[in-house]
Swiss-Prot record:
A molecular function GO annotation: nucleic acid binding
Segments of skewed composition (Basic residues): 399-409
Positions of region (Disordered): 329-351, 388-415
Name this polypeptide is given: Uncharacterized protein L451
Source taxonomy: Viruses, Varidnaviria, Bamfordvirae, Nucleocytoviricota, Megaviricetes
Domain of life of the organism encoding this protein: Viruses
Biased composition, class Acidic residues, residue ranges: 338-348
Length: 415
């Protein structure tokens, strides 16, 4: 049997496909079939390397934190160390050369005001770009020169702020990523999906990602069965279980550290350590793990899936049944009933009524609902007895009302 375990994050999601094999000696063997990381925001940040030169006349080639965009739309990256070298590719003097002074002011200033009107004064400077040519007066020349100088200078490459990033966009990116991987998952023969549960109040954005992941496999894998994938179970798992795979006494270590930040770092460090210990005899997987910067996410997905296979599978999954839709069975009419007065067979429209639907409730369930809503459970005989007693009470009430009316009429005095 094969399962897929998911470690949930806002930007990075890690998955691990594990295979559960029971040998002839009844020894449990767990193999890693595939594991990887999904980045939900990889296309939003500019990735460029530093083009600055070192002392040995070699290119720095580090990850750039600043970017220079020239008027011809060329990009140059710089790190903090080599930021001062940007003047080699473009300088302030190059920006000033784009403005030329006009000797004969035949044109008017084309600066657009906030009101939507042009300045209209006599132009003294001409700005020429690759696409357009503009004219400016003395006042607006200074402001435009300042704006162009800022535009053609190195700008910091900012990371996308996760808190300001729309949750709906993250969910959309996740669905698109999963659609691309759905055929791959179907070929691996995944049967069960285990997702790390997230607290809804501490981080609602992460909870939304986990819910989207759960709904995707429930809809695509169980209902639609896209690419003939056969998902039989989708469930959440407590995040604290992944560190219980190793038999070391880690609870005492967590109790000693009351600081939440230290606990978080310790959890990540222990996850990587436990994974390396469990994969001690699998050098290929360890080499593959070393290629990733965020090893903790992959390790968490692996430990969670391993804990499920060794301690939870077939023991507590009875509480997570898969609901199968069954069609209602109605009595089919006989051929004699389908014949009309002329004796010919004719198709008749069949209508569904509440009489055809039967709902069966056990005695225990009936007692439970009776206690919950303070109602007594009665069988058919009790109902009939109740109806007869109610009829007798109503008849006796009518007779008593008639007698009281006669008595009241006798006491009336007519004038």
């Amino acid at each position: 049997m094969r399962i897929i375990s998911w470690d949930v994050g806002v930007i990075y999601l890690a998955y691990c496909v594990l295979e559960y094999v029971l040998s002839k000696n009844k020894e449990v063997i767990i193999n890693i079939i595939d594991w990887n990381i999904i980045n939900l925001m990889e296309n939003n940040r500019l990735v460029i390397n530093c083009c600055g030169m070192k002392k040995g006349n070699t290119i720095c080639d580090k990850k750039a934190s600043y970017c220079l965009r020239t008027p011809d739309k060329k990009l140059f990256g710089y790190c903090k160390t080599h930021l001062t070298q940007y003047n080699i590719n473009w300088s302030i003097q190059d920006t000033e050369k784009m403005f030329t002074k006009i000797s004969k002011p035949d044109n008017t200033c084309t600066f657009l005001k906030k009101t939507g009107d042009f300045c209209g004064k006599k132009a003294t400077y001409k700005y020429k770009n690759n696409k357009s040519t503009n004219y400016y007066c003395n006042v607006h020349y200074k402001s435009e020169l300042k704006n162009r100088t800022k535009e053609f200078s190195p700008q910091p490459i900012k990371n996308t702020i996760v808190k300001k990033y729309p949750t709906a966009q993250l969910q959309y990116n996740l669905i698109k990523k999963l659609d691309k991987l759905s055929k791959h998952f179907a070929m691996l023969g995944i049967e069960r999906v285990v997702i790390e549960n997230q607290p809804s109040q501490k981080n609602p954005k992460m909870k939304s990602i986990a819910s989207t992941l759960f709904d995707y496999f429930l809809i695509r894998g169980f209902c639609d069965k896209i690419h003939n994938i056969d998902i039989k179970l989708v469930r959440y798992m407590c995040p604290s279980n992944k560190l219980k795979v190793n038999k070391d006494n880690t609870l005492e270590v967590f109790k000693a550290n009351k600081d939440s930040k230290k606990k978080y770092k310790l959890t990540k460090a222990l996850g990587i350590q436990y994974t390396k210990q469990l994969l001690n005899n699998e050098q290929e997987q360890l080499d593959y793990l070393s290629l990733f910067e965020k090893k903790d996410d992959l390790c968490d997905a692996y430990l969670q899936g391993r804990y499920y296979l060794e301690f939870i599978m077939d023991k507590t999954d009875k509480n997570y049944p898969i609901i199968k839709c069954q069609e209602n069975k109605f009595n089919k009419p006989n051929n004699d009933d389908l014949q009309n007065e002329s004796g010919d067979d004719s198709e008749t429209e069949s209508s569904l009524s509440w009489e055809n639907i039967k709902i069966e409730i056990s005695d225990d369930q009936a007692d439970y609902y009776a206690k919950k809503y303070n109602k007594s459970v009665m069988n058919k005989s009790n109902k009939l007895m109740m109806n007869k007693s109610m009829m007798n009470k109503s008849e006796s009430n009518k007779k008593s009302n008639r007698k009281s009316n006669k008595r009241s009429n006798k006491n009336i005095i007519t004038l």
